[in-house]
Amino acid sequence: MSSPTSTSPKSSFVFSPTSFPHAAIASNNVRPRTNLPPPPPPDRIPPPKGRSHQQKFKILRKEKDKDRRQPIDLEDDWTIEDVTVNGDGVEQESQYLDDLQPEENELKPGPRFLEMANREEKKEKTSKSRGLVKKTSRLFGRDKDKDRGKPEEPAVTGSSSSTLAAMRQSSSTSTDSTTSRSITSAFTRQNSIQSRRSPRTSFGQAHSRRASQDSQMSWPAPRSIRSSTTSHDPSSDPQNSASSTGVPIPQRQGASMSSLSRYSLPHPNGGTSRSPDTFPNKMSTWFSHLLPVSSGSPPSSSYETSSSIRKQSSVAASLFNAARQKAVDGVRHLLDSEAQPDKCMDTIWVRGVAHPGWRPITPENSTSNLPALEPGGSGGGVEDRRASLSMNGPSPNSLRPSSWKRNTSLPPTGQPQSPAHVHTQASNQTTSPSKGFTGIWNPSTLSLGMPIGGSPNKEKENGSGAESPSKKKSKEIVKWPEQFYDDFKSTVWFTYRNQYAPISSLSPNLLIPSPEAYYASFGPPLDATSPSSLRVTTPTAAAQQSASGSGGWGWSKEERGLTSDAGWGCMLRTGQSLLVNALIHIHLGRDWRVPSTPASFSEATTTQEIAALKDYAKYAQMLSWFLDDPSPLCPFSVHRMALIGKELGKEVGEWFGPSTAAGALKTLANSFAPCGVAVATATDSIIYKSDVYTASNLPSDDWNSISPTFNSSKKKRRGDNEAKEEKWGKRAVLILVGVRLGLDGVNPIYYDSIKALFTFPQSVGIAGGRPSSSYYFVGSQANHLFYLDPHLTRPAIPLQIPPLPVHSAKEKGSTESSSIMSTAEEESEEGVMIRTPETPRSTTPSMFSAPEHVEDEDQEEWGQGSKYKLDVVDADGVEVEGIDDDKGRNEGKMIREEVPKSSFESNGAAQEQPKKQKGFTSTASIDSQVDSQVDPHMLWYTTAYPDPLLRTYHCEKIKKMPLSGLDPSMLLGFVCKDEDDFEDFVERVAQLPKKIFTVQDEMPSWEEDDDAGLESVSEPDFEGDEFEEPGTAKPRFDSSSPVNEDSLKGPRVVSASTTATPLAAKEEDHLDVEEANSTDDDNESIGTTTAAGPMDIARHLNRVDLSSKREQEGDDDDGEWVGGTPSSQGVLVEPPSLKGTPSKSRSSAFEPRYEQNGETEQERPVFPARNRMESWVEPVCEGKEAPNGDNLL
């Protein structure tokens, strides 16, 4: 058989003597086989000489033809490089090439040439899937190597890929033609093997690098071992590579590479987009869904800095930024991030006040009003910063899309921005992806609504200045409406605080606000003769004493306690927010807004400025009540709320629920009369009108004993107790309603009702609404709620001890200054300073005085006497003396004269004693218009706390969340000023779409029979420690004598009606009950109401002839509980030998055992009492007792 020729379809070699001088080598190898028969089966032929060997060369030939047809697909020659396959690596290949050179020179075949073919045959057995994985890994490795080797080379836009492909094709064609004329098919096989084993710098490598460079526009690839071919990298130079490998390289290689200089890049155009057929493009499109930009995006962020260290994290930063950009809208609602101004035109309701929604506003045709030039804004500096951080030389403007033109806007002055200004502006802008993870969490990117970088569309939504100047002229600025924003900022916002005094236990007389402790905590009164004393800049000595922990508030520096409520006090803070905004609503009005700059003492000249100054003083005083200090001057501090919650079952440091917070607010507000607001809570989501009216009429007897203003106003209503419950009192009422509107989330049927609550003029917001946390919701718009987040920790503001308030008394019959319920027109008469020295008097602060006529007794009592009604003394040493009506009324002495002198000292100077102050006269007067209308005590509050500190109680960043993210457990707050306001509230509740709570007249009541019967059945147990030792009981009295009150130390007997008693004993028992009621009216009632005395029960038992039975049956029967079964009367019997402190849950019932002889009693052994229920269910023996206590016989 003749040797194969080029015409044979199955031949892998083409031997042409004219083209390849080494053809004799192949002919010598084939000549021994010329006389053989046709080739045997493949399994009988060795691999180097078999059919598979021919198929291998056929595959190489096909690949060569394929390379000629598709030169741009030469990426295969680098996809299996630098990988050890079957033990062959780069070092072995270099040794193999050295051994191959003599064979080429000698032009004769050798064993190594055959071994080479054998190795190639083994390599072909790798699977296609494994090759694809290798190709993918080499793709990333090659591009990463290019980034390190040439950091200063600019990126190539996608529009230039087709041009590069054409250049690669032309270079490949010319190179192939040269190779076909200079090397044989055997050399072609050798080069193909080399391309898979060692790095080569042939045209395939150069073009593959360019192809990978095209893919850099959409993602920065990692670095591999291969370095890019540049003029600055001598190791990758074509000539050096050729000399090192010994492989001839065409001269057109250098020309093709020089044509790809970054200074000769083709201009992009819309018709030359990247071809998706190339392999690198196919690889990049696999990850296109994770990338923030498309083919028309700006240059890659990997070239924005020349640092190769920072580029390593740019891939993860880009992916993170892309995911963040796409999910920012959803994450903003899920995580309750700060809301961005939107274009919702629906009405905004904030605590009963309607504000218009967004309205389009077009700015003037000037760049000075655009967000790009606003300091600290998010627009205008994005492109400038990108230019300053980009590569060394600026890229041509034609390479930048029209939507990404550099912002060349000038400042309003018309002067170009200095580099320092550009750098400062860039530092305030959003960071780029090249910053990596180190720049993601800087202050300018903490907002999830602000992107790290990305497409122009995202920056356009966020107000950046990346558009062309023509688009900037018609751009609309999206911001919150001014009216809504001012109202939102004026809402008081309490957050976590730290660095305050430890929360430790307080004595009972200091835990609940009391007038003695409150007024005793004030500092020395202001001297009316010294206007400079109104300006307080440093804490007084009492304030320092309070801060040091050596005061008399039950805690000291050595005690340990929580000094921060971070993590557990969010419900307390939102509860405080409800109360303080209710106080502002009542005292300052719903239309009050926090001033941008508070009025100064010296600048207030007009009537409006004076009114604003007084309002600001009231505002500062109310905030001081909520400061974090255990002083009695802070009745609503977190200390007292936490300790009250402890009394309600929650330990300090444990998260409070809405019901616990409502209970703490109710206890503190109802005990502090000067606030002018009482709290009424709903029961099982039901508001009872009787509870609301009772709260408005809460007595202030303790405060009346100190304040003559309250005393005079209350005296007129002391005899009108019945009308007191039916008419509205002098206090406003804060109604707190705890509701739960679902299981895991709010039921959507209640959405409209929740939104309607913010339209009530009585609304003060909602506290709670988050799982295991609490927000303060203040408004609604469409299906979203505006809220204040208390989960922000700030340092506590120290308390400044105010001076003792003073007040002047006008002539007899004159009206006093306005009260806590006064309106704006009544406030003008408030706070006249002392000008009549013969009638100085002290009351609560002037804003809390009642507009009532002073009675004659009060004028005589307070018209003459000491300068101050209450001197500054220690709270523990206050003793009030009663004033006799027959004498001493003119002296008006309320405090004992043995007051420590130190309590009157101020700055080292001692005040005069009350007796010496009796004839005190003031000759000084203040001519200022402000001083004549504003109380100096109130002016003290205008300077006591700096405005920056009070600003921490207001939030300027609006947050918004959807209704779907609301937690079903929440606390609703409504404040009613008067009866008309309350009736309007009731009507609005009845019109809610879905009833989430109701209003009823009064709580239903049940008869005592049912209560007593239920008590005796459900709670039959008692504590054994309530008994005293046998033999210590006091003697009983005869049944004919009335019960002595001194002989009873514990709860009295509880008895119900005698419906189950025998008919023969009903009349006598009824008389016994009346007799007991007549004798026990003055006894203290603990637990259930008393209806019968202890001896009455014994007389009743004697009448039914049970005494003889007891003596016969033994002592066990004596201890049985008479009554208490479902079908009998509820009779609870107790011994008089109970301890002085009864059980708090209920009065334990049992009967002592005595043996009576005549008028004296002999003590019998005391045995534990038994429940009467036991005898009824399991009778001990027949014929003993019936369940109602009667004899069964």
Curated annotation (Swiss-Prot):
Catalyses which reaction(s): [protein]-C-terminal L-amino acid-glycyl-phosphatidylethanolamide + H2O = [protein]-C-terminal L-amino acid-glycine + a 1,2-diacyl-sn-glycero-3-phosphoethanolamine
Domain of life assignment: Eukaryota
Signal peptide: none
Residue spans of biased composition, Acidic residues class: 1004-1029, 1070-1084
Annotated Gene Ontology cellular component terms: cytoplasm; nucleus; phagophore assembly site
Polar residues bias spans: 186-205, 253-262, 270-284, 389-447
Region annotation (Disordered) ranges: 23-284, 358-474, 807-869, 899-924, 1000-1171
Documented EC number(s): 3.4.22.-
MF terms in GO: cysteine-type endopeptidase activity; protein-phosphatidylethanolamide deconjugating activity
Residues forming the catalytic site: 570 (nucleophile), 789, 791
Keywords attached to this entry: Autophagy, Cytoplasm, Hydrolase, Nucleus, Protease, Protein transport, Thiol protease, Transport
Localization, UniProt: Cytoplasm; Nucleus; Preautophagosomal structure
InterPro entries assigned to the protein according to its UniProt record, in alphabetical order: Papain-like_cys_pep_sf (IPR038765), Peptidase_C54 (IPR005078), Peptidase_C54_cat (IPR046792)
Main location: cytoplasm
Chain coiled-coil ranges: none
Function: Cysteine protease that plays a key role in cytoplasm to vacuole transport (Cvt) and autophagy by mediating both proteolytic activation and delipidation of ATG8. Required for selective autophagic degradation of the nucleus (nucleophagy) as well as for mitophagy which contributes to regulate mitochondrial quantity and quality by eliminating the mitochondria to a basal level to fulfill cellular energy requirements and preventing excess ROS production. The protease activity is required for proteolytic activation of ATG8: cleaves the C-terminal amino acid of ATG8 to reveal a C-terminal glycine.
Family the UniProt entry places it in: Belongs to the peptidase C54 family.
Protein name: Cysteine protease ATG4
Organism of provenance: Cryptococcus neoformans var. neoformans serotype D (strain JEC21 / ATCC MYA-565)
